[in-house]
């Protein structure tokens, strides 16, 4: 598998001199398996992914890939209107996600591109979109890869995903909150994984002292507890708070995280690696 971060920021795109190193685009990760392209979330980083696909000669009328949405908060879907391959007839996309308690994924995306919000409505985009709802614990086979979804804790609900191919595995658990106990569902999902990508929106001090309990986000300390319990090899801190500069991330998250688990890293926009 070849993995690339196109968006690592949480909540809102955060451009500027203070976020150049780790990136300002919101959640979007590409995973190229042996035969297929899998995309985790569709934040503002999706625009850059679309440009890369076009430059590489893909998605010009016969392209296909599969999207897996953690949830439908805006920072995880806002890249769809700016995804250039969606404007090319003949391209097709499979969208997977947990049905929202109030509406479907398709309705959420259509509402985002209502004519009062955006000049092109979702239903007018020329590409073909296929929607599939997932239940807790479902596994989807995409070519040589298997993707398993597990429901975690976040306002409105959220899915974590384990992507596995040929004995290698990566777990994506953004926008999840630990509350006062270990989330054993995530431990089970992450068991023996090569990499855990985990929501580290807050420092432990921010989480406790600024009364952010219940906001649906977590800390590096809690993520490392999962890593150790599940026997994960590598830990990636993700969903960076918009208020956290590059310097802050390195000093207040990376340095203390490495003391607890040396193979800890900050997810960085543009970082590409292979499993």
Kindly label every feature range from the protein language model.
Residues 1-171, 186-187, 251-275:
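Binuclear metal-dependent hydrolase catalytic cores
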Residues 178-269:
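Cap/insert and terminal regions of metallo-dependent hydrolase folds
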């Amino acid at each position: 598998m070849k993995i690339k971060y196109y968006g690592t920021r949480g909540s809102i795109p955060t451009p500027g001199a203070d976020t150049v190193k780790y990136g300002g685009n919101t959640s979007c990760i590409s995973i190229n398996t042996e035969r297929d392209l899998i995309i985790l979330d569709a934040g503002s980083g999706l625009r850059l992914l679309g440009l890369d696909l076009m430059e590489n000669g893909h998605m010009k009328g016969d392209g296909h890939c599969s999207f897996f949405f953690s949830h439908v908060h805006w920072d995880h879907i806002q890249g769809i209107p700016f995804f250039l391959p969606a404007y090319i007839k003949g391209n097709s996309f499979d969208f997977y996600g947990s049905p929202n308690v109030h509406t479907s994924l398709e309705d959420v995306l259509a509402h985002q591109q209502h004519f009062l919000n955006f000049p092109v409505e979702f239903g007018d985009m020329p590409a073909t979109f296929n929607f599939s709802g997932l239940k807790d614990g479902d596994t989807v086979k995409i070519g040589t890869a298997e993707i398993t979804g597990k429901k975690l804790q976040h306002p409105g609900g959220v899915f974590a995903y384990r992507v596995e191919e040929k004995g290698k595995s990566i777990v994506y658990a953004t926008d999840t909150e630990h509350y006062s106990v270990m989330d054993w569902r995530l431990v089970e999902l992450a068991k023996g994984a090569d990499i855990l990508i985990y929501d580290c929106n807050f420092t432990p001090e921010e989480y406790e002292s600024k009364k952010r309990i219940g906001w649906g986000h977590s800390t590096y300390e809690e993520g490392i507890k999962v890593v150790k319990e599940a026997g994960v090899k590598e830990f990636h801190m993700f969903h960076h708070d918009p208020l956290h500069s590059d310097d802050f991330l390195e000093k207040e998250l990376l340095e203390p995280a490495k003391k607890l688990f040396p193979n800890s890293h900050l997810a960085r926009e543009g970082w590409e690696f292979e499993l």
